[in-house]
Amino acid sequence: MLDTVDFESRLREIIAAHLAMEGPLLPILHAVQHEWGHVPEPAIPVIAEALNLGRAEVHGVVSFY
């Protein structure tokens, strides 16, 4: 089980480290998967909001790969 505070803090660090990249979604998802071994469901809305994308769009990329 993920500790919510630590999880969200670490997730936001990962997102911030990739925001300046062109097309940061895949690098963020790869980093998240590297950190936790998968992309946790609670990460999807946080990533979507940070990138100004819809949750469905992020979920679609996660489920495709």
Predicted feature locations:
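Signature of N-terminal electron-transfer/Fe-S-associated modules in redox systems
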Residues: 1-65
